[in-house]
């Protein structure tokens, strides 16, 4: 069995998980509701406050789907109880972030400010001018929005300027040495 897939997903109190016959999993919790269609081959059952995922065969594809399905359901449960967040840091002279309504304005050394429109299910927080926190209940969406923001100015290896994740380490290069 898949080591990830064979572990059942614990359902905390205040969370309800429902599975339709066509494998659409709905998770409702204190922070909101998430819904995702899972692969039709996987059997998903809710048994005494646990979600159990079983696979039809031991083929390589089914083994991979088994662990994936269990991990996706686990992320949905964590999302509706705790939520997810990604922290981005703006490194560079004059680089700053600010909120305008619900959208995010970034000054990244370009001739124009960059505006990131608010996306449903994702909120932005700015603890200080050089830090942006992307929060939401959908792990995939939070990571995707954070990655999109990072692409506006990826960290460069010589001075380390750009937008980086808070836990990311930038590999630095040495510049050219003069004669």
Swiss-Prot record:
The keyword Nuclease does not apply. One of its GO terms (cellular component) is cytosolic large ribosomal subunit. Gene3D superfamilies: Ribosomal protein L6, alpha-beta domain. One of its GO terms (biological process) is cytoplasmic translation. It comes from the Bacteria. Pfam families: Ribosomal_L6 (PF00347). The keyword Ribonucleoprotein applies. Signal peptide: none annotated. PROSITE patterns: RIBOSOMAL_L6_1. InterPro entries: Ribosomal_uL6-like, Ribosomal_uL6-like_a/b-dom_sf, Ribosomal_uL6_a/b-dom, Ribosomal_uL6_bac-type, Ribosomal_uL6_CS. Keywords: Ribonucleoprotein, Ribosomal protein, RNA-binding, rRNA-binding. One of its GO terms (molecular function) is structural constituent of ribosome. This protein binds to the 23S rRNA, and is important in its secondary structure. It is located near the subunit interface in the base of the L7/L12 stalk, and near the tRNA binding site of the peptidyltransferase center. HAMAP family: Ribosomal_uL6_B. Belongs to the universal ribosomal protein uL6 family. Part of the 50S ribosomal subunit. This is Large ribosomal subunit protein uL6.
